[in-house]
């Protein structure tokens, strides 16, 4: 395999799909050497097959707004690969949603799910719809319309969607209700459900908790004392909220959150129940701003239109969206003495930023490893649904802690390069090898 030849082919077949092509190139560069050591991969056309989704569904989603006007959005479901288990991945409702973004997310999801060691394939879906500014009734009508088309292509052993940006417990509940009505079954077809009807303990916190567990393992592996360190995070939703809680519990001081309007710096730390509650209130307000934080905690400062990466801290964890941390941000963090960056959003760093961290031997881990706690907890929810059991917080947290430790160990095994651990390479190779071997064993299909 030659990466450039594959990329030239993909660029010709999928012009304009920049996010998807970026994700594929990162993986191919990491796995090229090990791929060429396995002639059975070449014989079975693994690369040519693994970079194309099994199937893609595109459909219109008509719904009626509160003024009685018919609105139409575009819905998608990308079923990328089910070699190791049923398709599994979230649904995103955001105006930016397009096929390139969902293919990139589905491609990443395939390897992320492989890292968890749970039997889950990769998929992703969504629509170019924003719940922000919509009434409760409008959101319900949209979710129900979306599911009337999606339901026939999903199922507990086929494809199990979950939440993502713009899709929380409320939206999952509305979609599950319509699925249940259409399919006439109450099964674990969606995860991220409310606890009252089949959801798992710790699901809202799991991505953030898992990310901090991964950072904890990175620190232990590399001889870094994390207690007392300062941490800059972006975002203010579920992921950032989970990170702030677990980091505080482990003695790490979170000092920033951010939104589309800018970022907040709190020198006292975002580390009390009142401040965690404030993060949830900011999210639930629907205003998509963080500036109101300083009204409740006046010792904090708000920096309009800026990113939190300019602050001098020890660790950084982007928790908002893809490509939010660019090369200039990476250089600023390095200059300010940041020693560890954990990509907590999906592909939160541009390719140039990721390459800069690795080139400068900084401790840097990619999203497919760091944020796998969310889908891991979804897998645990699937298990509980299938067994008709409910686990306690402690049981779920124990599993989550173990899974994140296992993911870290896989990254170290495949990413160790002398005294340095290339977590990007390690995560990509570990996930790729599991999927590729499963595809070889199952034949060309």
From Swiss-Prot:
Cross-referenced InterPro entries, in alphabetical order? Aminoacid_DH-like_N_sf, Glu/Leu/Phe/Val/Trp_DH, Glu/Leu/Phe/Val/Trp_DH_C, Glu/Leu/Phe/Val/Trp_DH_dimer, Glu/Leu/Phe/Val_DH_AS, Glu_DH, Glu_Leu_Phe_Val_DH, NAD(P)-bd_dom_sf
Kindly list any coiled-coil regions of this protein.
none
Q: What class of enzyme is it?
A: oxidoreductase
Task: Give any Pfam family that matches.
Answer: ELFV_dehydrog
GO terms for CC? Answer: cell surface; cytosol
Locations listed in the record: Cell surface
Q: Which GO terms describe its molecular function?
A: glutamate dehydrogenase (NAD+) activity; glutamate dehydrogenase (NADP+) activity
Cystine links in this protein are none
Which reaction is catalysed here?
Answer: L-glutamate + NAD(+) + H2O = 2-oxoglutarate + NH4(+) + NADH + H(+)
The EC number of this protein is 1.4.1.2
User: What keywords sit in the KW lines?
Assistant: NAD, Oxidoreductase
Active-site residues annotated for this sequence: 124
GO annotations under biological process?
glutamate biosynthetic process
Q: What is its main location?
A: other
Assembly with partners or alone: Homohexamer.
The record's family statement is:
Belongs to the Glu/Leu/Phe/Val dehydrogenases family.
Q: What does this protein do?
A: Probably involved in degradation rather than biosynthesis of glutamate.
Name assigned to this protein: NAD-specific glutamate dehydrogenase
